Amino acid sequence: MALQDDKPGSAPKERSGRQIRSSAARLAAVQALYVLDLAEDARVDQVVLDFMSGSMGGMAIVEVADPEGIFDPTEEIAALEPPDGELFAMLVRGAHAELARLDEVIGASLSADWPWDRLEPVVRAVLRAGVYELLERQRTPPRVAIKEYVDIAAAFYSGAEPGMVNAVLDRVARSARPEAFGGGV
């Protein structure tokens, strides 16, 4: 089992294997959507197959701290946890099939400070996967989905991007699933 900090200053809590595979599926889906966004000739079924077979994805550059704290951290390539294949494929195929609708929802949820043309490809991929999951996967609690995608954004960006991802996904979730936030149905 892996540990995850729930809140700053709180004790880490154990995550189940299923939760870890779901998180890995979300990260892999963001990576796959990024590939599909940038590679005009990429086919969604081939990208899904490449990720599931391990020929794409599955690795990350991680920072490793010096145990004595004398030297700067070093970077190493590490294997990622295997993703939940069903969730991964559903997110990639679904988001890719619904790009126009997702982009419209995202565009309507952006603030004036973050117009569509300011979004980098990684941010677009994070938002597309997150919005698709919020709209189409009712069994995922919205707060869980939002946290997962904000964490993914934070893995790529140290600036304002994770906060923007949080704001957009929160707006979408509150509109699409108000009952999860104490709103009416």
Curated annotation (Swiss-Prot):
Pfam families: NusB. Keywords: RNA-binding, Transcription, Transcription antitermination, Transcription regulation. InterPro entries: NusB-like_sf, NusB_fam, NusB_RsmB_TIM44. One of its GO terms (cellular component) is cytosol. GO terms for biological process: DNA-templated transcription termination; transcription antitermination. GO terms for molecular function: RNA binding. Involved in transcription antitermination. Required for transcription of ribosomal RNA (rRNA) genes. Binds specifically to the boxA antiterminator sequence of the ribosomal RNA (rrn) operons. Belongs to the NusB family. This is Transcription antitermination protein NusB. It comes from Rhodospirillum rubrum (strain ATCC 11170 / ATH 1.1.1 / DSM 467 / LMG 4362 / NCIMB 8255 / S1). The gene is nusB.
